[in-house]
Amino acid sequence: MALGRCIAEGWTLERVAVKQVSWFLIYSWVCSGVCRGVSVPEQGGGGQKAGAFTCLSNSIYRIDCHWSAPELGQESRAWLLFTSNQVTEIKHKCTFWDSMCTLVLPKEEVFLPFDNFTITLHRCIMGQEQVSLVDSQYLPRRHIKLDPPSDLQSNVSSGRCVLTWGINLALEPLITSLSYELAFKRQEEAWEARHKDRIVGVTWLILEAVELNPGSIYEARLRVQMTLESYEDKTEGEYYKSHWSEWSQPVSFPSPQRRQGLLVPRWQWSASILVVVPIFLLLTGFVHLLFKLSPRLKRIFYQNIPSPEAFFHPLYSVYHGDFQSWTGARRAGPQARQNGVSTSSAGSESSIWEAVATLTYSPACPVQFACLKWEATAPGFPGLPGSEHVLPAGCLELEGQPSAYLPQEDWAPLGSARPPPPDSDSGSSDYCMLDCCEECHLSAFPGHTESPELTLAQPVALPVSSRA
């Protein structure tokens, strides 16, 4: 009896356990069916907040989303639904695992520049599905985070280290829009030690030996981002906005040995020659033109005034070009003779006339001013002297030859008649003083019986008429 009773009770307990498990499975299936079939929009006033979402695309086929929300319970599930705004039948589901979800497009699909999605959040809580709007205009091209560069390698040679890397084949049409940043350091240093940026449109980089410490082991890593397009594309709304990618796997390399001497590549020599030769030819031509045109420029800007030193030797040899001292010495000679001092000036007189004669083609001789007509009626003035008393003997010999100077008749003014002298009762005291700088023959004036030798000419006062 006791054994049969225990067996019966065991069967009863087993049946109860089976029933409980069955009911649990049925409840779970019903709850899951209710979450799939019922959508309850999230109310803004109460309930659990959705939190913030960050969805970044690799610009090819993948979107990574991060959800900064409270931890989900075991009875809750959440996912993001991407619905195309161009083709509503295209929908992609991204299920969260530990606040992260990754959407991978099928192999036959890629993201295009004009793709536009609506993102909604779906949560199943206690058998009810809650739907909330995340973004109604999600543009993958403005939320780009590229994959890090792959296959980073180093090639150390004499004096340099060449780093190369690769990119996805789908990004090759956009290679000119890719910008890289390189970080390199010694193994014992931090990564923030050395950086190189502004590496655009290339997949290689050269590190010179002078940038690295000799005898050290270095590590380098790389990251990439897509640069903005031109301003015109930005105004039209078709620009790209990118974040820096994650760092690539580091590569190690020894520092290259520095070169002993400065070796300039052959192509740099050729470029230098192409620059130096035209400059040299240009300077040579400029110097040639300068020396060729300098005499002409001097003749244009500077007048060539001849020096009278060759004709007046005493003026420059004795008086050093002082004309006033030279003329003062010439006047002092006749004055000394009048005072009774015998001074011979024949040599100086002849030298002066010889110097003047060299300037003309005929011997020089003193000329008489025909414009000064002597009037015999004037008191105190002798009559007009004759030409035989004025011209020296040397001038008489050249009467038949043409003179180098203008004839004396041409020196006379237009009016041949001299106005009458002023009346004595007019009281006019206008006189002009004539100072003869040269010596005159006294025999030219009648009534003088002095020596025929030259004497100093005295100033002569001539009356000047004030009447028109």
Swiss-Prot record:
Glycans are attached at residues 116, 155. GO terms for cellular component: cell surface; extracellular region; plasma membrane. The chain crosses the membrane at residues 271-291. It is a single-pass type I membrane protein. The WSXWS motif appears to be necessary for proper protein folding and thereby efficient intracellular transport and cell-surface receptor binding. Plays an important role in the immune response against parasites by acting as a receptor of IL9. This is Interleukin-9 receptor. It comes from Mus musculus (Mouse).
